């Protein structure tokens, strides 16, 4: 391994750690394309990214827990279904051809941009209904209702589409499958699904997501390690950088407006999807 590659891996790890704390993703959305660009096989990129994510997510979640922003019961409810499906994802990753693995990863990024926008519209609709009820003098609103309001100030269950238990199982299962299949912690699907199905604010979804990623990434990495796909030295370098980056970003997240965090998350997904589609095309035409 050259000095240049070593520095690139360390810098990428720090950047992924910063994204983990700010956006609730393990960093796989950045690390997988980077490792593919460094000529690692897609299945190795997926597996090694998972190892890095374990270290990064543990670092960020410990910091969130110390600051009182992490609900362990919520993490457990979403995380345990992910343990089983992560093994399924790790198995499928070894079967798919490289170009198909990258293509479906890019489609996943696009899907998440759409899900976040859907949730944004639903939240706006619910807030408008509450505002209309206040103007009509509905009981229970009174002097304590102030605008603008947050998700947590909406009426109970008004912001939840499905039963919470079902929503947690569905969210965790999807996250685990993606963790094993694509080498992501699952945050790219957990954040929008928590917002969409559980009615969480984006900051709460991010903090819970990072905690769940600890579980999903460990499970997925174990599955890949059993198949010999993990590059341990590369993963530890990335993880060391991620540990530092996550400590910084988790301290700053509570100070940022939800609108800025949401815009940053969607912008990142859009840029990465373009790169991943290009990589998929290159793999396809080169056989």
Predicted regions, residues:
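Transmembrane helix boundary and interhelical junction motifs in multipass membrane proteins
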Residues: 23-31, 183-193
